[in-house]
């Protein structure tokens, strides 16, 4: 008796794994996730979610307002001009941006040879990590790398700087500002932390729709391979690999389903999986994600 049962294999793509928030103690410093990756996750959510980015940008602009002002309105006074020379409006705005996006900020404090304040420069917080705290729980230094994912490569080696108040002479120091978070010794989470899954969801929905449209409004494809059920696992794996190489570029559909069929004289076929109601399926979730993002940011009115 002929066996016409099918061996089905599902190929999935573009699964994103959220980085684990974990403190890694290595060589005297602490990283916020593997290779300091949690900051990258926050950055991706910021740029990937339309609603989340709009709310963050609004808060940043509200916090900055018109910037710092001279209390007597004398913007030409020597003291005010000296202050702006030390701490520019651009650095002020960047520090506020880091504080909103990352929940903390860092600045490079540069003294003169006479130990007076010379310059306050913004340092992107994603590039600055604390040293391991001493026995009293004090963080006496910070480490800087242009890219922590490349910390072992030449030009990206971490450099240690004293924390503000711990430098000797005219050493450049680093100041990190962050609010108190329960259970957090080294890092402070942004105040919108519960928003992140919904921000990620908005990004994935946008990517889904884009790929859905580029793929001719198809959810994916079924590749029917006739007279292939008797193939060995090695032969099926080899065929599956070829299909992946040919059909699964970044602009293709979500999934490819390979069907290894029984005896059949028909040629191999590719069937498109259609869904005329795909846009309706995501309407509720899209609205819900937007509402949860606004709620998480306390921007409900």
Task: Describe the predicted segments one by one.
Residues 219-234, 256-301:
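Surface-exposed loop-to-helix/strand elements on domain peripheries
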């Amino acid at each position: 008796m002929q066996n016409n049962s099918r061996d089905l294999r599902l190929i999935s793509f573009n699964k994103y794994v959220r980085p684990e928030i974990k403190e890694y103690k290595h060589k005297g410093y602490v990283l916020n996730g593997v290779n300091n990756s949690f900051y990258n996750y926050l950055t991706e959510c910021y740029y990937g979610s339309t609603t989340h980015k709009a709310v963050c940008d609004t808060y940043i602009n509200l916090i900055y307002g018109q910037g710092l002002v001279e209390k007597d309105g004398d913007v030409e006074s020597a003291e005010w001009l000296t202050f702006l020379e030390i701490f520019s409006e651009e650095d002020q705005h960047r520090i506020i941006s880091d504080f909103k996006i990352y929940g903390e900020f860092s600045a490079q404090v540069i003294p003169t040879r006479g130990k007076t304040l010379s310059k306050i420069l913004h340092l992107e917080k994603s590039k600055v990590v604390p040293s391991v705290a001493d026995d009293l729980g004090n963080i006496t230094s910070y480490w800087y790398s242009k890219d922590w994912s490349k910390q072992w490569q030449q030009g990206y080696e971490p450099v240690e700087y004293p924390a503000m108040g711990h430098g000797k002479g005219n050493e450049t120091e680093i100041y990190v500002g962050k609010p108190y978070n329960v259970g957090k010794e080294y890092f402070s989470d942004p105040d919108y932390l519960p928003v992140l899954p919904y921000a990620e969801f908005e990004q994935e929905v946008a990517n889904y729709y884009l790929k859905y449209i580029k793929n001719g409004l198809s959810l994916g494809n079924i590749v029917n391979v006739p007279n292939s059920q008797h193939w060995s696992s090695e032969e099926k794996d080899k065929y599956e690999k070829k299909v992946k190489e040919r059909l699964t570029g970044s602009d293709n559909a979500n999934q490819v389903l390979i069907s290894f069929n029984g005896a059949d004289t028909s040629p191999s076929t590719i069937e498109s999986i259609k869904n005329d109601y795909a846009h309706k399926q995501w309407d509720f979730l899209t609205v819900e994600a937007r509402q949860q993002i606004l709620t998480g940011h306390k921007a409900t009115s």
